[in-house]
Amino acid sequence: MKQTKLTGRIVVPSDPGYDIARINLNLSIPKLPCIIVFCQNKNDVCNALKWAREHHVPFRLRSGRHSYENFSLLNHGLIIDVSEMKKITVNTRNLTATIEAGANLGTVYKKLWKYGVTIPAGTSASVGIVGLTLGGGIGMLSRLFGLTCDQLVEVEIVQACGKFGAKIIRASEQENSNLFWACRGGGGGGNFGIVTSLTFRVHPIQNVSIFSLTWEWKDFIAAFQAWQNWAPYIDERLTSSIELFPKQRNKIEVKGEFVGSPSELYPLLSPLLETGNPSLFIDEVPYIKAVQFFNSGNIPEKFKRSGSYVYKPIPLKGIQIMQYFLSHAPNKDASIWHQSLVGAVENISPNETAYFHRKAIIAQEYITSWKCDVEENRNIR
């Protein structure tokens, strides 16, 4: 049998660019793959999968390098990287966009903005579109339009077939519908194949209103209670987050986006404005400027992140536990972040897609990072 050759841009440990090619966003879990293939098209993906099967080489899939636990890396194996496949095609008549698997959110937002449309997706520009979508995908338009995966029309995916083969298939409501169900929130990492492109419904967008409110540490409990009793239930055009910072930073911050004018937004903020004495920022901007406002500008670092879904308002004791932790945080870079949900997210039943948490009112994430290895235990214990 004729053996398959790897195609695409191939990087091995002896190449000068190997160290840059192998690292992910999280530097605390380094891995040393033996080959990294930067696929240029879906045929390169097929060849990489065939090669791995023929040579019995373990492999991982990678796009945006945002796997928190570096599940997209491995030692002594093959990385099938699709990050250089970035083509985006917009159909303005049907209001759809077909996006190759390597595009990150920054690239997607900029391209779609040229056509006056967008998809509801995340806030970090460097996140890959595929990993986000397969996990569900939340962001500042979630309560108005739903999850990123809710906009999916079709998935193009490479799957293993036969003893050593690979094939390109499509999944939609009409074709391979069970696979399409699984791809909408069933998780990233290649659970069901290697996604090479996604087709989404897109939404017209123009100007939006952005805002932030900031309290001092003394208002920790009152500010969080006010936000969590307001954010999941307010006008669906408004999605917001609250980030709780360590005591040494003396800051609690709410940020949000409203698809409407500042004059409509201001009265909606009353429950927050009446809590303590927050500073307020409001502006009406083109949507692409709002994307920049929320982008956290992630850079590679050593970190640990985990999260949970909240189905009922967190009781006072729970808020006090968060306050206690952040008053004893290992450094100033720890935080607890929350985003409001429900709205359009719950318009789809939990069984209609693989994303189950339709009734969750809040997504919660625990964040910490460190500079030196000796600080690791204090940050992740």
Can you describe what each PLM-predicted range is?
Residues 1-381:
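Soluble FAD-dependent oxygen oxidases
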